[in-house]
Amino acid sequence: MTEYNGYVTDETIEGADDGPLAGKTVAVKDNISTEGVRTTCGSAMLEDYVPPYDATVVERLKDAGATIPGKTNMDEFGMGTTTETSAFGAVENPAAEGRVPGGSSGGSAAVVAAGDADLALGSDTGGSIRCPAAFCGVVGIKPTYGLVSRYGLIAYANSLEQIGPIAPSVEGAAELLDVIAGPDEHDATTQEAPEADGSYAAAADGDVDGLSIGVPTELLDGADEAVVETFWDAMDDLEAQGASYHEVDLPSVEHAVEAYYVIAMSEASSNLARFDGVRYGQSGGYDGNWNESFANAREQGFGEEVKRRILLGTYALSAGYHDKYYKKAQDARAWVKQDFDEALDDADVLASPTMPVPPMKRGESLDDPLTMYLADANTTPVNLANLPAISVPAGETDDGLPVGLQLVGPAFGERQIIRAGSALA
């Protein structure tokens, strides 16, 4: 284990003798299946679960010669923004003492920031790669939905989540994306990206001369003053390298957080129904009837945040409320996607602070879930729109806290955001 509690399991998995990742260590988030090595999702419910197969991305890592040093800590079932809801203890931030590392892939970002792994895989449902990358001062890519296989990812919200890379540099993240991207017969949502020149890593050339950047004003409104100041400094840096920027409007993002949480919680209530102590998960005992056994397993196995989201999701899907909540959330999702598509007609990429706040103090948001949800305001819209995004270090506040800059591209426009991001990191 690391001093930052970045790993849940530090069991080494060896890859092939050679390949593009030979000699490199790639940590894997603990909701991604690894054959013969336990995969807990940060939950007591799956404390002893050992998958009988590898996720597709794990197979691709091994084939590429990577060594997996362990499974990284995470918010339970990916539900959190701080990596404090794990049943295996909170993760500390190597880049900001006493602050959270972000979530839910906080362990992956922390081990990369601390130098305990060269690279890492996370998963991003509403910002779970980009948030910890921003808070830990590293790079994280949320790929276009369908670019990377989700086979072997223990699902939280199927229509939103993607597996992606975390690295110290944009080039390193792009090299990892080159390995894991591509169609998979085991995941019908994957698709072939349109043909393009060169690898993702080759796009990390730092050339932003002539790049047009749209800045959505709505994603700056209400952001912390120090974050906004650091963001504009980074934008000035890009401008000095030949890029230009202008304001764009995304009026729909005002409703993105609530739409995201209705959809994500609804999908979670369905996905997590399988963890009942009989099909999957720790047993609730065999005293009493089946309902009591199921209830005991879920009461003991799930943490408070997971229970909250399951209950809210079940409510949103219940008879009489489906049209009131879930259908309206899906309508808002379509509006968000339309707004992004229109904004990207007038810009090559969009830019905003990754997170509207710097890393919070540990323990600060645990008793205030609404504050934690609202911190996702800049990242969740991208998942609703199924677009690619990257978080790169923009600098630090006067207090020395890391700030991330998010770049969003059109569908399968990973090379555009990688090229833009590599001018900064």
Curated annotation (Swiss-Prot):
**GO biological process: what's one of them?**
translation
Q: What EC designation does it have?
A: 6.3.5.7
One family from Pfam that matches here is Amidase
- Its Gene Ontology molecular function terms? ATP binding; glutaminyl-tRNA synthase (glutamine-hydrolyzing) activity
Query: What catalytic activity is recorded?
Result: L-glutamyl-tRNA(Gln) + L-glutamine + ATP + H2O = L-glutaminyl-tRNA(Gln) + L-glutamate + ADP + phosphate + H(+)
Q: Which Gene3D superfamilies did the record assign?
A: Amidase signature (AS) domain (3.90.1300.10)
Q: Does the keyword ATP-binding apply?
A: yes
Q: Which domain of life is it from?
A: Archaea
Fetch the PROSITE patterns from UniProt.
AMIDASES
Q: Under the cellular component aspect of Gene Ontology, which terms does the record hold?
A: glutamyl-tRNA(Gln) amidotransferase complex
Keyword check for Membrane: no
Q: Which residues form the active site?
A: 29, 104, 128
Arranged from A to Z, the UniProt key words for this protein are: ATP-binding, Ligase, Nucleotide-binding, Protein biosynthesis
Known InterPro entries for this protein?
A: Amidase, Amidase_CS, Amidase_dom, AS_sf, GatA
Q: What does this protein do?
A: Allows the formation of correctly charged Gln-tRNA(Gln) through the transamidation of misacylated Glu-tRNA(Gln) in organisms which lack glutaminyl-tRNA synthetase. The reaction takes place in the presence of glutamine and ATP through an activated gamma-phospho-Glu-tRNA(Gln).
Per UniProt, subunit arrangement is: Heterotrimer of A, B and C subunits.
HAMAP family attached here?
A: GatA
| The family this protein is said to belong to | Belongs to the amidase family. GatA subfamily.
Name of the molecule in the record: Glutamyl-tRNA(Gln) amidotransferase subunit A
Organism of provenance: Haloarcula marismortui (strain ATCC 43049 / DSM 3752 / JCM 8966 / VKM B-1809)
